[in-house]
């Protein structure tokens, strides 16, 4: 947060957009993907249609749960049933919307390697853009096995807190897309190092951005100044939330995002509005349990 703020302050102090401080724009706009919602396939298809009608060229959803969350934000996740539903979701989306739209799947590290490999072999025919977090992130060596067994593009990195965990997967070419989280790895400064490092291995970056307007602006600034960009995560159109807190946000149109040609990150923060806002406890993403009662990854 401090690093990103310092880049914004520097840009505003010399009246330059942050993306120009990072090396200058190499593109006018950044292709982006939204979060397609739906706990079941009919709801997912409805959400997918809405996003396609709005102009998005990419869709992203995660490994489908097998039960809705209860009042305590808990749910049962059956890996075998989830794999079946996820494969079916691809089949239905391709049947209805064809292959002009790109699909990204986030496994959320919920499957063991054997199930991941089985699922990916079934998904090959539906040509996903990438499979994200197909294995737990503690042991990058697992990507050696997945690389041998899976032909689909792999994405990983959102859980890594600095450039060092990226070393092995970049140097050994174990992933196709680096999911750098600017708010975890150390801001724009560290993310820029990882981006340039990945470029030497022809690995594109897909910045992780499930957060708010400042994170989105920082990610898009990096993408506008970097050549090796796959796609940018953008959960929803900028400007749909936090409009009073952030009266100026980045731009979006027809599936693309970009930072305006203004000093700093391109966002304005309303301090007076922040002081008036009550702080609400954040809701967790939910707790998942296997059918036998054991805890599993969210």
Protein language model features and the residues they cover:
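Metal- or metallocofactor-binding catalytic centers and their adjacent structured scaffolds
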Residues: 1-13, 298
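Alpha-helical packing segments of well-folded alpha/beta enzyme cores
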Residues: 5-6, 47, 89, 194
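Short, flexible active-site-proximal loops enriched in glycine and acidic residues
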Residues: 13-25
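Proline-centered loop/turn at the N-terminus of a beta-strand
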Residues: 17, 31, 102, 153, ...
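Metal-dependent enolase-superfamily TIM-barrel catalytic cores that perform enediolate-based chemistry
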Residues: 29-149
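Extended hydrophobic packing segments that form well-structured cores
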Residues: 265-298
